[in-house]
């Protein structure tokens, strides 16, 4: 699945052009409010089990129409001759406007990166899921679970998202099959901060365009960056045909083709072993 397609206009352009202009936090014509929703969009798409297609972290919320012409006008699918300017050369606004210094943009990169790490390292995201909005789609709830796991492991994840133009409370309807309340859940996108839940239906406040991700156990993700310099491993010769050596010992080495196919796996390799 995917939240936006390469042959349809960008989410942020659609939001600020055709989005809801009412309420306390309108998105129509309000780039900040629109960008604030990108985290929730990621949470309700990336975290759902199964493959996802994204492009450059949604281009950090690029709000330029894909149908922008050389002169700055937009010739989209609603015009008499639609899509004339889809292939026109466009200003790369992410560089001219220095988006890497814009926290509204970089928060998308940060949030989506965390979600990708969470999904690709926690086995529960290989399990099942249920989508069950609270009364309407603006109060979105997604339940991700693997009932074969013990409760001492991360076996349940609850995603809440508020797509309204107002701050709302959401009934989380936390699972009760193997849990008793009060109990502690963990905010997986906030450094595993513990949250005491007194009742599975106790309302949780979620600001407009925001989201929460709860787990029955903390994520095992480490916050420590991998130090490439001190953990450098050299493989030589490169390229190699029949044999190669490594500069350090390793518990396991796997070799893949450029298309992702596993070619060979080695275990307990010693330094300089061929």
Predicted regions and their residues:
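Conserved, mostly hydrophobic/aromatic
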Residues: 6, 45, 57-59, 115, ...
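C-terminal outer-membrane/trafficking sorting elements
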Residues: 226-274
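Residue-level detector of functionally pivotal "anchor" positions at catalytic/ligand-binding pockets or at interdomain
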Residues: 128-135, 216-236
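Surface-exposed beta-strand/loop patches in extracellular or lumenal glycoproteins
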Residues: 163-179
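Solvent-exposed beta-hairpin/edge-strand motifs
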Residues: 175-192
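Alpha-amylase-like alpha-glycosidases and glucanotransferases acting on alpha-linked glucans and related
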Residues: 1-48, 125-138, 150
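Glycan-recognition and catalytic regions of carbohydrate-active enzymes
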Residues: 50, 54-57, 62-157, 215
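C-terminal beta-strand-rich structural cap/linker in extracellular carbohydrate-active enzymes
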Residues: 197-220
């Amino acid at each position: 699945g995917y939240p936006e397609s390469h042959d349809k206009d960008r989410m942020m352009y659609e939001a600020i052009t055709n989005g809801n202009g009412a309420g306390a936090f309108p998105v129509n014509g309000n780039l900040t409010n629109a960008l604030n929703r990108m985290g929730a969009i990621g949470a309700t798409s990336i975290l759902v089990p199964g493959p996802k297609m994204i492009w450059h972290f949604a281009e950090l919320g690029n709000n330029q129409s894909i149908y922008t012409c050389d002169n700055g006008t937009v010739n989209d699918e609603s015009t008499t001759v639609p899509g004339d300017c889809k292939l026109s050369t466009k200003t790369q606004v992410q560089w001219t406007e220095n988006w890497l210094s814009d926290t509204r943009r970089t928060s998308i990169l940060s949030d989506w990166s965390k979600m990708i790490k969470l999904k690709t390292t926690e086995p529960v995201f290989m399990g099942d899921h249920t989508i069950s909005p609270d009364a309407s789609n603006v109060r979105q709830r997604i339940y991700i679970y693997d009932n074969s796991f013990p409760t001492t492991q991360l076996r349940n994840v609850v995603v809440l998202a508020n797509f309204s133009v107002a701050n709302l409370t959401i009934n989380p309807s936390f699972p009760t099959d193997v849990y008793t309340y009060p109990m502690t859940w963990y905010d997986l996108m906030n450094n595993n901060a513990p949250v005491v839940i007194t009742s599975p239906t106790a309302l949780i406040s979620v600001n407009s365009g925001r989201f929460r991700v709860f787990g029955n156990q903390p994520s095992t993700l480490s916050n420590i960056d991998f130090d490439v310099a001190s953990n450098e491993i050299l493989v030589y010769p490169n390229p190699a045909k029949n044999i190669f050596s490594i500069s350090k010992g390793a518990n396991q080495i796997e070799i893949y083709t450029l298309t992702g196919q596993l070619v060979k796996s080695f275990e307990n390799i010693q330094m300089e072993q061929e």
